[in-house]
């Protein structure tokens, strides 16, 4: 599974600059999911890959970014 890293409290994507490989996104994806996850900056949001199927990604059901 893959998808945008989401803040569970606000419902917003984690934003980033520096499109493509991005140390911030790699670190945040691994902190949220696990060490084998990877992340990069895509369309100014952290996109995480190699996630487990139950991983929660953006958009959250019934919660809009404020």
Swiss-Prot record:
Gene Ontology MF, one: sodium channel inhibitor activity
UniProt keywords, alphabetically: Disulfide bond, Ion channel impairing toxin, Neurotoxin, Secreted, Toxin, Voltage-gated sodium channel impairing toxin
CC per GO annotation: extracellular space
Main location: secreted
General function of this protein: Beta toxins bind voltage-independently at site-4 of sodium channels (Nav) and reduces peak current and shifts the voltage of activation toward more negative potentials thereby affecting sodium channel activation and promoting spontaneous and repetitive firing. Has an inhibitory effect on voltage-gated sodium channel hNav1.6/SCN8A, affecting both the activation and inactivation processes. Also reduces the peak current of hNav1.5/SCN5A but does not shift its voltage of activation. This toxin is active against mammals and lethal to mice.
Species for this entry: Centruroides baergi (Scorpion)
Name of this protein: Beta-toxin Cb2
Domain statement: Has the structural arrangement of an alpha-helix connected to antiparallel beta-sheets by disulfide bonds (CS-alpha/beta).
Any Gene Ontology biological process: defense response
UniProt key word Disulfide bond: yes
